Amino acid sequence: MCNYKFETLQLHVGQEQPDPATDSRAVPIYQTTSYVFKNSAHAAARFGLADAGNIYGRLTNSTQDVLEKRIAALEGGVAALALASGAAAINYTIQALAQDGGHIVAQKTIYGGSYNLLEHTLPHFGITATFVDAHNLAEVENAIQGNTRAIYLETLGNPNSDIPDIDAIAEIAHRHSLPLVIDNTFGTPYLIRPIEHGADIVVHSATKFIGGHGTTLGGIIVDSGKFDWKASGHYPAIADPNPSYHGVSFADAVGPAAFVTYIRAILLRDTGATISPFNAFLLLQGVETLSLRLERHAENTKKVVAYLAHHPQVEHVNHPSLPEHPDHALYEKYFPNGGASIFTFNIKGWQKEAHKFIDSLKIFSLLANVADVKSLVIHPATTTHSQLTDEELADQGIAQNTIRLSIGTEHIDDIIADLEQAFEAVKAAE
């Protein structure tokens, strides 16, 4: 189906024909733990990876399989792996690349959970990271060490929607024989396909825009199929014979899909961050309307940004669509159809004013999720990024008067009216 447009692919890939057992047009929920083998030889072939197919529910499920094929197609990859959460997708990706003793060069303005994983958790497992200003290409390149195993970016940084130059950093990564990993949670494949700009691996918290309705946890890893895992000798887990599969080399056995196959066959098998069939089904419901929702998110965001940019109680708006934003040129290059519906602004005042504004909102929900059809709000410094020191917060552009918004799909007049009455509440409390 590679010749079809995005809007068609999001509806059909992975289930081009009705379900063969029931003729169901909707993707069924295959709520099972395990699968019957035809005979002993068939079972042995499945377990030995000689025959592709379902083995056990921790590894694969037919509902999950449709989701994986659909996201892989939308991102332009060769294969994907759906997992229980976005955190699992990021963790497995980093562990598969760095192993014990590896090093990651990471953009410093990333999701707080990813920052904590790289800065505090993974060092206990022998994996270290250097955080860099992704706008400074020399700093990115100079951070590469002999044990570096990947460069890690977000298409739109969290929470400020800053944008790295993916093409330029991909060139640096590949010149050093490193894969470029990009978290495209905020970008989505509808707005940007990082693989087309040189990314080798794309990860998602499917909980966000892919699901879109705040109901379902999930994560996705997409393999571009373009990285040569054998060339540098730095990725033995993927390229060399694996003792737990009788000497199978994933790079040799499955070729372009080696990376996600390794994670499925080893990390997922042994540590079990499995997505449930029902969650895979719910995420598929979200995928089917992804383009429609993103258009409305982008349309509403454009109007909210314009409103905030001229509001007398706003100190600063961090949105790359604004001409004065340092990433405006990159925004026009990588996001020609708009986007960045999760962004921050600084209210005049400090934490007291920020909290009063947030607590006065009526349509916006105060919660930790983003990219819901409902508009959301949070105070990053005391919640999502509260584990960071004051110095780390400042380094990521987060102050005590910074407020993160996730613009939903409600009517724009109601969204702006809610923001305005919250500003009035702040003024009345002075």
Predicted regions, residues:
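N-terminal "arm"/small-domain region of PLP-dependent enzymes with the aminotransferase-like
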Residues: 1-61, 69-70, 403
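PLP-dependent enzyme catalytic core of the Aspartate aminotransferase-like
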Residues: 119, 128, 146, 293, ...
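Conserved small-domain helix->loop->beta segment predominantly found in fold-type I
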Residues: 271-274, 278-280, 285, 289, ...
